[in-house]
Amino acid sequence: MAIPLSLGSAASSAQTLNGGREPLTVDRLYDSPDLAGSSPRQLKLSPDGSRATFLVGRKENLHFYDLWQMDVVSGKVSMLLDASKLQQGELSDEEKARRERQRIYGEGIMEYAWADDGKALLIPSAGKLYYYTLADGKVRLLPTGDGFATDAKLSPKGHYVTFVAGQNLWLLTLANDKLTQLTKDGGGVIKNAMAEFVAQEEMGRMTGYWWAPDESAIAFNRVDESPVEEVTRNEIYADGIKLTQQRYPAAGTANVQIKLGVIALPQQTVTWIDLGQDTDFYLPRVKWLPDSRHLSFQWQSRNQQQLDLRVVDVHSSRAPQTLVAERNNIWINLNDDLHFLKQGGFLWTSERSGFKHIYRFAADGTVTQQLTHGDWTVDSISHVDEKQGWVYFTGRKDSDIEKQLYKVRFDGSEFTRLSTRHGMHQAVFADNKAVYLDYFDSLSQPPQVSLHDAEGKRLAWVEENAVKPGHPLYQYAGLWQLPEFGTLTAEDGQTLHYRLFKPVNFDAHKQYPVLVRVYGGPHAQMVVNSWSSQDYFTQYLLQQGIAVFQLDNRGSGHRGLRFEQVIYQHLAVAEVADQKQGVDYLRTLPWVDANKIAIYGHSYGGYMALMCKLKAPDYFKVAISGAPVTDWSLYDTHYTERYLGNPHDNAEGYRLSSVLPYIGSYQSGLLMYHGMADDNVLFENSTRVYKALQDDGKLFEMINYPGAKHSMRGNKVKTHLYKSLTDFLERQFKLHNH
C-alpha cells in the first residue's frame, strides 16, 4: 500500500522553484559556475569563535578553491588566502589514493587547520606545507625535506608540525625549523603513521597518528602489509597502461598486521601497546584522554561482531583495560562519537537497543545514563559543552528523511530541537565560544551556511546562497521539479520510503517512461530532503519526458539495525524484492508506461541495477550499471565480510550474491560503464560480466573510461557519461528521433 506524503511536511509545497525556465543541457550540468552556487566546504570556526573560515570554488573554475573568512562580529566576508599564492604541483601516488578514499577532488587549497591559539593556519598544498600568520598576513613555506608531505597536523599547543613522508613520521619544530624523523623503518611493506587501505576506504579512518593534548607524546600505528596479497592492477590510460602493484585484501584473505606505538617527546623513545593475542583484528579508532597519560583505542574483531573500547596508561606496564564491550551476532557499525569528559567518564553512541543512541559512562565503563531513546537514530555528536552540561547532536527523531540538530542535558533531560527548517543540517561548533555554523540544504535550497547562537537563533548569514537573479541556478529554476514523497510496506512489515519526480509539463493523460535511480547499499540514503549534485541529471531527464523514482530498500542506512541487517549473508534478496515492490507501485499509476521502466545505479547501485535486471527482467526492461561489484570475493575484507561473513564460512552466500550465476536470464537492454583505473571496485568486476555475456552471445553496450577512478571525477568524463546514458535511454525508450 502506498501512502503519499504531503510535500509540505518535507519540502516546499511548490512543484518547482521560482526563476527562469531555460532548459538544462548535459554540457551545463557540471560546468562552472556550479548550479548550486557558492557552496562552502571545510567549514571551521577559529578556536575563539571570532572567525568562520571555509573554502569556496571559483566562479570560473568551481574545482579551484580559495580560503575565505567571515568576521563573526561585523559579518564581513573576505578572501583570507588566495590559493594562487601557493605552489601547485603534481600529487604523489599516495596522496592521490588518499584523496580518492576521501572523495576529495579539486585544486588550490583542499584542507587547512587552525592553530590552537587562533593566530595561525597550517595549509598543505601539493606536498608542501605553508604556515599562515593572521597578524601580518604572511605565508611561510615550511621545510619538509625531500619527500611529499601528507597528513600534516599542527600540534595541540602549536609548537610543532607533524607529517608523513616516505612512509615515516616527521616532526618540525616551528621555533627553529628543526626537522626530526621520528620513525625510521618505513618503506616498502612497512607504513608508519599511515592508515591502511581498508581503514581509509571502509572504516573512515584517514590518519595513522594522534597527538597527546599536552604535546608530550604521539601515538602512531605501524602497518606491515606483507601478509596482504599483492595484485598487479592495470590502470589503463588513454596514452598507455600503468602496471600498479597493490596490496589489496580481498574477502577471506589476509589483512595487514598492525601495531600501536607511543613516541615520547622529546626523548623519541617508542613504547608498544599490548593489543592482545589475536593478530587478526582491526584498529578502527585511537583517541587520547584529556590527561595525556591514558590512550584509548577501539579493537574490532575480524568478523566485526565484537567492538571493545580499551584504555591504557602509557606510563605503566599494565595491560589495557576494556571499558566497553559491544557485542552483536550480525555486525557492529563504527562511529566517531566517543568523547572523553574532563570531569571524568565519557560519552559513547551504541546501537545496543536496535537504534543508535547516546550513552554516558563512568570512568570505569559502567553506564550511568542513556541520553536519547526511541525508534529513531542519532546521526552523530556535534559538540559537548561540559561547562553548561549540554550534548549537541544531529538525528532523525522527527523524520527518517531529514537530519535535524538537537541538544540534551547530560542527565537526558531538556531534550530540545535547535534547527527549524525542513532538510539536512550539519553543525560546526567553536571550541571556546557558544556559537555554531549550520550547513543546511534541502531539495529546494542549495547549500547555505549561517551562524547561530547556542539556542539556535540565527545571528548572520555566512553564505545565504539564495536562488535569485544572478545565482547560477536562477535561469533554470522555473523548471526545477520537486518530488512527491511516499511510503510502501515491505514484505516483513517495515516501512520503505520513496520519492517520485514527475516530468516537466506533466500531463496525467499521457504515459511516461520511468528511470529507477538506485543505490540500495548500507549506510546510504537516497530518499531524503536534501540537495545533491546527483540530482542535476535527474532534472535533465525530467525535461526530456522521463520520470525518476527512488526507493530506499531494506539494508540502507539510518533506519536502525533490523532494517539494515536483513541483508546479512545474502545480498540482493531483500533489496531486489523491495525495488520490485516499488515497480509494483509504479504500475498502479495510469501515467506510467509499465513497458518502459529502467534502473540505473553506480557502485553498489551498479550492482543493484544488474541484480534487479537479471533477477527480475519482467520488472526492469532496461538497466544501466556503473562501476559495479559483480563478484564479492573480489571486494575488500572489511566491507564484504561485514555483510556476507567470511567466504570460507559462507561460500553459497557469496555465490548467490554474485551477478554471474544469473547471467543466463539476460536478454537485452543493458549498458555498463567502468573507470579503467578504478582502485576500489576493480575493473575486473565488469570484465568478468563482459566475458560471460559475450560467451553467451548476448548483446549489450559498454563504455570504459581510460584513467578514470571509481568516483568518475572530472567535467569531461561526467558530460560524456551523461550524454551516453541519455542517448541509451532515448534509444531504449524510443523517444524523440530514435
Annotated model-derived regions:
Residues 3-7, 11-435, 443-445, 451-452, ...:
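Beta-propeller folds
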Residues 42, 229-230, 272, 284, ...:
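Serine-hydrolase catalytic core recognition
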